[in-house]
């Protein structure tokens, strides 16, 4: 399966710092090619190549947009940022949309990254393009259905293609390891770990628990974490009513109030240390109602794996 896209992009930026309009124009072909081999029904190996463009956000471009500032610290935009071009190569083996093992290589031109600069007692965060970056991603995901305690492996494998994950109790494990290679520095690899549990209780009640964790001493471009990052446990109790059209949920986000940021900038020596902690524990109730439709093709996708990969803009500080 192959496809190609032709994009033309023109952006004009007008600020009080420039007498003339600063503009850039891109006219490129963005191909997309995929090859898939099916071993058996539901099990396949796929290779994909695609070229993408990512435009800098307005907040990054606008030099007047000071997201935060005081006498000692400030963040501002950069009107000279250029669009980022990604050449992505991915290989992945997957089974029944739930189990997968994958590798992705991104060759990036004009990656937007954050640099923290210290001049005396004044610290500023700037956004710049760097000419080239290689980003390696290794990821794995698999479920552990609780039915393994009551059914044989043969029975479970035979029902994988027809199983509805909304009706099954399971523990899902996901891990991603990212390695960034820049010309100036070689950051430590970045681990992202996630556990998601779903337990189907009596009376149609579901308990969902989601735990995510990024360990300390991992690298993210010109930053290194000193303490675990994104360390959160979220719990949700939900039940559907009215033929599944009405969904009522009670939730607690960051149950132990452990989410915080503690990192250092390695762009300059001595390093600038950053630490931020606020009360991130939240409680709430959510009520959702799905309006009935006569479109017989409209239905929820039971696939628990996200398929869209978003390109980030290289910064810990937003």
Task: Specify the residue positions occupied by each region the protein language model found.
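Residues on the lipid-exposed face of transmembrane beta-strands in outer-membrane beta-barrel proteins
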Residues: 6, 33-37, 89-95, 103, ...
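Surface-exposed extracellular loop regions of Gram-negative outer-membrane beta-barrel proteins
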Residues: 1-21, 26-36, 193-217
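Outer-membrane beta-barrel signature, preferentially recognizing the C-terminal barrel domain
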Residues: 53-109, 125-146, 278-279
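Transmembrane beta-strands of outer-membrane beta-barrel pores
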Residues: 4-12, 49-55, 97, 105-111, ...
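Conserved C-terminal beta-signal and adjacent last beta-strands/turns
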Residues: 187-318
């Amino acid at each position: 399966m192959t496809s190609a896209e032709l994009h033309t992009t023109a952006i004009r930026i007008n600020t009080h710092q420039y007498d003339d309009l600063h503009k850039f124009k891109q006219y490129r072909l963005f191909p997309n090619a995929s090859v898939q081999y099916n071993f058996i029904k539901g099990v396949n190996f796929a290779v994909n190549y695609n070229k993408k463009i990512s435009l800098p956000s307005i907040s990054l471009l606008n030099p007047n947009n000071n997201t935060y500032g005081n006498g000692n610290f400030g963040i501002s935009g950069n009107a000279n940022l250029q669009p980022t071009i990604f050449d992505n190569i991915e290989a992945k083996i997957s089974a029944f949309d739930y189990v997968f093992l994958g590798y992705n290589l991104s060759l990036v031109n004009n990656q937007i990254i954050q640099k923290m600069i210290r001049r005396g007692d004044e610290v500023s965060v700037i956004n710049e393009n760097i000419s080239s970056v290689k980003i390696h991603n290794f990821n794995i995901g698999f479920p552990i259905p609780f039915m393994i305690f009551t059914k044989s492996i043969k029975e479970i494998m035979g029902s994988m293609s027809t199983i509805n994950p909304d009706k099954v109790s399971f523990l899902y494990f996901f891990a991603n390891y990212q390695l960034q290679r820049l010309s100036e520095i070689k950051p430590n690899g970045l681990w992202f770990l996630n556990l998601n549990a779903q337990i189907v209780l009596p009376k149609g009640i579901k308990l969902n628990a989601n735990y995510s964790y990024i360990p300390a001493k991992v690298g993210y471009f010109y930053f290194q974490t000193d303490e675990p990052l994104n360390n959160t446990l979220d719990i949700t109790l939900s039940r559907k009513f009215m033929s599944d059209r009405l969904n009522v949920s009670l939730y607690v986000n960051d149950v132990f109030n452990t989410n915080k940021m503690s990192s250092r900038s390695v762009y300059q020596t001595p390093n600038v240390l950053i630490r931020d902690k606020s009360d991130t524990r939240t409680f709430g109730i959510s009520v959702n109602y799905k309006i009935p439709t006569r479109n017989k093709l409209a239905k929820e996708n039971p696939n628990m794996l996200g398929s869209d990969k978003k390109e980030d803009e290289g910064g810990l500080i937003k």
